[in-house]
Regions:
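Pan-zinc metallopeptidase signature
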Residues: 238-240, 246-318
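Soluble non-cytosolic domains of exported or imported proteins
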Residues: 8, 113-120, 176, 180, ...
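N-terminal low-structure segments adjacent to metalloprotease catalytic domains
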Residues: 1-98
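Post-HEXXH active-site segment of zinc metalloproteases
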Residues: 196-226
Length: 318
């Protein structure tokens, strides 16, 4: 199993394009990134962006449009239209690409120096836990994207029905930031396994119907309950906040206990309302001990695995 990072200007361009078109109003939309990416846009470009936005929003599966754009599979008229009308904007994007290209090259080389040999057995156990064959753990490609200079950390996206991950690393490169980038890559790789799991879908749906619907709990702001269940499990596997099941291999440290992180979370509660991301990480941490037992004992995912996290949501969101 190998994870290979690469630079592809066309992939990065279409990611930039969909961001500046502002088609997405979900939790995935990042306003600071939008602002940075958009600073090169001129008034004359707005009709193009409006048309791109309309095409993506009108599709029954907008994320499939994005997957095909990133894969450069222009196999219908809307995809070909987006590629055609957006071509003049490549010059706008070029200044952003050139500004970070040198650092992206360093990140590509660093990521490709990572070894995943020590993670392969653990990832195979995770596949079994999800009801997948061990051979579901396969090679993946990481396409690097321009980050914004002020970004506090790396961010990634696992593209459904593909073998690739989109990654915005830190804007600057140094050895201390490698660990965070590696964790994000494995978090997104975990999403790829979760996306394949019918058992996860069944367990999540059953948990939602049993615990969420009867109490009419409202999901954390910016998230649907479907995305919450996905993130709960992915954070349990790899997280910059709670470490996750893979923490010993990724950081050389065990993941923290609930009691160890409780003072920090309670300070957040006392000072201000925690972010949705912080709430989901905190809930994931409560799942982690039992999830670890399931994986090590080769038990498959079921509804019960989510119950510790649901109790946290019940306390915080009711």
């Amino acid at each position: 199993m190998n994870i290979v990072a690469t630079l592809n200007k066309n992939v990065a361009f279409f990611y930039w394009l969909q961001t500046v078109s502002k088609w997405d109003k979900s939790y995935a939309f990042e306003y600071p990134l939008f602002t940075y990416y958009r600073h090169v846009i001129q008034p004359a470009d707005e009709p193009i962006l409006s048309q791109v936005r309309a095409i993506i929003q009108s599709d029954s599966n907008p994320y499939d449009i994005l997957r095909k754009l990133y894969s450069e599979k222009f196999d219908n008229k809307n995809l070909r239209l987006i590629a055609h009308i957006s071509a003049p904007l490549m010059d706008r994007f070029d200044s952003i690409w050139q500004a970070c290209h040198e650092n992206l090259v360093m990140w590509r080389n660093a990521i490709n120096d990572f070894s995943y040999d020590d993670l392969y057995p653990q990832l195979q156990k995770i596949a079994v836990f999800l009801g997948l064959d061990r051979q579901a753990v396969q090679d993946s490609t990481v396409f690097l994207l321009p980050p914004r200079p002020e970004a506090s950390g790396p961010a990634g996206h696992k593209i459904s029905s593909s073998n690739f991950i989109l990654l915005r690393p830190h804007y600057s490169f140094n050895d201390q930031k490698k660990e965070a980038v590696r964790i994000v890559i494995l978090h997104e790789y975990a999403h790829g396994l979760i996306q394949q799991s019918k058992l996860f879908q069944e367990a999540g749906r059953s948990s939602y119907e049993k615990f969420i619907l009867p109490k009419k709990l409202v999901s954390p702001p910016g998230y649907t309950w479907r995305s919450v269940y996905n993130e709960l499990l992915a954070y349990c596997i790899a997280s910059r906040t709670i470490g996750g099941y893979l923490s010993p291999q990724l950081t050389g440290r065990p993941y923290p206990t609930v009691d160890e992180l409780r003072p920090s979370f309670e300070r957040l509660l006392a000072k201000r309302k925690p972010t949705s991301n912080q709430i989901i990480n905190w809930a994931s941490l409560h799942m982690l001990p039992e999830l670890t037992d399931y994986i090590e004992e080769e038990k498959m995912i079921d509804t019960a695995i989510f119950e510790p996290a649901i109790k946290v949501f019940d306390e915080l969101l009711s």
